[in-house]
Amino acid sequence: MRICLIAEGSYPYVTGGVSNWIQTLVTGMPEHEFVLHTIGAHESQRGQFRYELPVNMVAVYETFLAPQSFSGKRWARGIRLTEREKAALAGLLGCGGARPEQAEERIAPPIDEVDWDALFGLFRSRRLRHPADLLAGRDFLDLLVVSGAERYGHIPLTELFWSVRSMLLPLIQTLRQHVPKADLYHAVTTGYAGVFGALASHLYGKPLVVTEHGIYSREREEEILKADWVREHLKELWIEHFYRLSACAYRYADRVLTLFDRNREIEIELGCPPEKTAIVPNGIEVEAYGNLPAAQPDGRFRIGAIVRVVPIKDIKTMILSFALIKRELPEAELYIMGPVDEGGEYEAECRRLVESLGLADVYFTGHVNVREWLGRMDLMLLTSVSEGQPLAVLEGMAAGLPWVVTDVGDCRGLVEGSGDGLGPAGIVVPVMHVERIAAAAVRLARDPRLRAEMGRNGRERVRRLYTRERFINEYRRLYDELGEAETWRASASN
């Protein structure tokens, strides 16, 4: 079977949990042939792969969201729109009719609000030589004037136009790309990747699987609410846009998978039909983390963090917490193990924070072989403000190490279990709560018996529930099931 994986903002440009998940999936199914359609942010990323591509990944197609230039007279031609296309665009802009009753409580448009079939046809039409042919057309501008008056009367028309332009350009560019032929499409998020998967399924009539590690629309909402690049009166417009992209993926998908119960509940709340949803947890090679090389006893207490140095991991809270830990445990050391080149100014700010606090024994190791370092650690720490089901936590648990984790994603489920009869594998603390994080770490540092017990609990939980074999077999079964259904449909139609 040929499977087209569709990634966004991850593999193969960025190391981390989602990218490692993709690498594990592909290498675990040598019987299948994979092609990759990957969506990056900027053209400068082209060819800058952080992973050695598996031998059964036979092709890579790269798309980038950074908008093309509008300069040049050849982009000045506008196009006329059919009534169906106008209605579809109005729906995409949230102006397609009466707003749902729940909209005041939850920004989540109904799943069938947008006529995506019409938009796919419009955005890929030969009439459209460039996105500007649409955005500069009289029909579109008239639609924007009318819609703006009805829904966005509080936004100046010029400002509304440039905001809508910024929203639509990446979407149109994504949907105008070559769509590789495959027997099955698998988007590893919703968003632009999910919409591209919906397009592929629509064009070729093939099954679509969507896997959400985190809930894409919720993550974009959190980013936009905090962002200073979006004016306050435009944030609702942007937030709803990303909810519509996710709704598109839910609508066209044959299966929508996620990693844990709460994510599935959120997907259903956002309009995904429950019968499409399922849970397949992450999985790792448990035995690879047994009997790791350990440091010789030297009186030091080593705290490890397997993490990229980026804002969503909240490294600053980790550093501030370590400053409190250091007051109680002068022998403590903090090892931040992960790429530092993605953080940009944030990474520099973290280093300056360490200096300003006068902290010794904070080490930014950069990218390392995690298995070579885990055995040296006494305790693991995660202070993220958003997560899915972190592979890093599973790796530490498999190594028999206790954790202090913030209460995000499925961290509580991993550490405390969900009725599996095992005890806790660490301590769960509130997000950004420096004092609680530090207190939990100090408590575990002073109780080696508790650390050992939690380490055993964690390793056994991973061995029972989060193995690579189980993860691969679940997806193999799903691929085979959808592939057989597609074969049956094809034979029945002949």
Please state what every model-predicted region is:
Residues 201, 436, 443, 450-481:
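A short, well-ordered alpha-helix in the C-terminal region of glycosyltransferases
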Residues 262, 283:
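Carbohydrate-associated surface elements
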Residues 293-324, 335:
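Conserved donor-binding/catalytic core segment of Leloir-type glycosyltransferases
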Residues 333-348:
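Glycosyltransferase donor-sugar binding loop
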Residues 347-367:
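Nucleotide-activated donor-binding/catalytic signature segment of Leloir-type glycosyltransferases, i.e.
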Residues 385:
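Aromatic "clamp/platform" in nucleotide-sugar-dependent glycosyltransferases that forms part
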Residues 402-405, 409-415:
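Short hydrophobic beta-strand element within catalytic cores of glycosyltransferases
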Residues 416-418, 422-434, 443-448:
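Conserved acidic donor-binding segment of nucleotide-sugar-dependent glycosyltransferases
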